[in-house]
């Protein structure tokens, strides 16, 4: 974090975090900020502080026009290591299991099935693909796995359960010509973190102001001033949960 240095913020990691200064805010973002203050919301200078709430600048991971992804922050520094092979455009089919131990993965690249084995296997395919791969490999709820003729290697009913998402709804307005903003400016600068009136969970809601939400339903790149502004409300701490099930083998 190049803006704040305290016990909640790192200072030496490969992913840059920063916030837009008030002088750099778009007019629509500034109007959203000032309206929230007028309606009684607190000012929030640091959304990454776990105790904060209110309206303020969003932490972003772009710097000097470059978004610092994990590919840039981590892989670009490590891709030339002798003990690292990066396989792009590859589809993992399943884990390779020997007894009760994962020994590798079976993946497809250029229509060829390839086995890759190692002493340690780390599965980090996200909240949906990780349980999906486990079930394809025979790890999970037998009632679901057996439907598709996959041998059950390890019965683990919790695989794919308690799936939580952050549903959102957007409301978009057409801006008057004098309120339109530079198309090359950042469309997301300000966020509101708050507790909904009927919730027992603190800060269960996030509302972001965005000038990049398309009114016509499609995203595109244009040199014309942005002519819309939207509020995107996220349910950030949901109570309900869902499941991931296999649909085929």
Regions found by a protein language model. Name each.
Residues 11-13, 88-91, 101-103, 148, ...:
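Residues that flank catalytic or metal-binding motifs in active/ligand-binding sites
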Residues 1-102, 108, 170-174, 182-183:
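Conserved redox-cofactor binding core of oxidoreductases
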Residues 12-18, 126-128, 176-177, 225-229:
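Flexible glycine/proline-enriched surface loops and loop-helix/loop-strand junctions
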Residues 94-95, 100-183, 246:
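Glycine-rich loop(s) and the adjacent beta-strand/alpha-helix scaffold that form part
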Residues 169-249:
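FAD cofactor-binding and catalytic pocket of flavoenzymes
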Residues 44, 85-87, 151-155, 208:
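General small-molecule cofactor/ligand-binding pocket signal
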């Amino acid at each position: 974090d190049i803006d704040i240095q305290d016990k909640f913020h790192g200072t030496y990691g490969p992913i840059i975090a920063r916030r837009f200064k008030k002088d750099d805010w778009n007019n629509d973002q500034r109007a959203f900020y000032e309206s929230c203050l007028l309606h009684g919301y607190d000012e929030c200078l640091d959304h990454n502080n776990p105790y904060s709430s209110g309206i303020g600048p969003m932490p972003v991971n772009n710097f000097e026009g470059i978004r610092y992804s994990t590919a840039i922050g981590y892989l670009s520094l490590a891709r030339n290591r002798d003990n690292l092979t990066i396989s792009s455009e590859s589809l993992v089919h399943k884990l390779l299991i020997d007894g009760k131990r994962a020994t590798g993965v079976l993946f497809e690249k250029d229509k060829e099935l390839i086995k890759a084995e190692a002493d340690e296997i780390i599965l980090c395919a996200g909240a949906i693909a990780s349980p999906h791969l486990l079930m394809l490999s025979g790890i999970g709820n037998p009632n679901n796995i057996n439907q598709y003729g996959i041998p059950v290697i390890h019965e683990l009913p919790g695989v794919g359960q308690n799936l939580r998402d952050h549903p959102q709804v957007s409301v978009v307005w057409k801006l008057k010509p004098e309120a339109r903003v530079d198309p090359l400016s950042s469309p997301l600068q300000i966020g509101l973190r708050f507790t909904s009136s009927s919730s027992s969970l603190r800060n269960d809601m996030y509302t972001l102001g965005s000038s990049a939400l398309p009114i016509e339903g499609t995203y595109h790149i244009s040199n014309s001033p942005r002519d819309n502004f939207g509020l995107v409300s996220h349910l950030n701490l949901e109570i309900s949960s869902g499941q991931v099930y296999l649909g085929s083998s």
